[in-house]
């Protein structure tokens, strides 16, 4: 069951008018967006932090390399540490965390659109519009392929 829809329907059953319904539900959508943005920001922090950690590793590798310039055999392994930590930082940021941020943004946008569609349906109910009119209005927000499936279900 969709709690957002249930809450809106309960408000209508309890006698809330359209204006009160819209105000309350839009407030819920805004709160949800703020929560999502906060979570996206936390993961974005890791996207920004990973290359910095890679650079710290690079500096450590360079310090090790420069500290042992007298021993030619130690230069290679120290240089490898320097280069690998840069690679690890870029890999973690771009291959692990960036896709997570992208998915979080996509899911958030999807949920906002979904809730706005639910709100439009609830507004139609509050205005006592015909069920067919509400159905047509909501179907118009769908891609054409899904619209045809929606009409068959009617």
Segments predicted by a language model, with ranges:
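Large intracellular
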Residues: 1-39, 111-154
């Amino acid at each position: 069951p969709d709690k957002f829809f249930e809450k809106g329907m309960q408000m209508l059953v309890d006698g809330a008018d359209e204006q009160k319904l819209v105000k309350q539900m839009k407030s819920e959508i805004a709160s949800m967006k703020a929560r999502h943005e906060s979570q996206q920001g936390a993961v974005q922090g890791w996207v920004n932090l990973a290359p910095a950690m890679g650079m710290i590793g690079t500096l450590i590798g360079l310090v090790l390399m420069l500290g042992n310039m007298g021993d030619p055999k130690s230069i290679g392994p120290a240089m490898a540490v320097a280069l690998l930590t840069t690679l690890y930082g870029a890999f973690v940021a771009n291959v692990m965390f960036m896709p997570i941020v992208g998915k979080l943004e996509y899911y958030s946008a999807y949920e906002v659109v979904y809730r706005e569609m639910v709100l439009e349906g609830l507004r139609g109910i509050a205005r006592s519009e015909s069920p067919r009119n509400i159905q047509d209005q909501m179907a118009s927000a769908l891609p054409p392929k899904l619209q045809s499936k929606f009409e068959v279900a009617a």
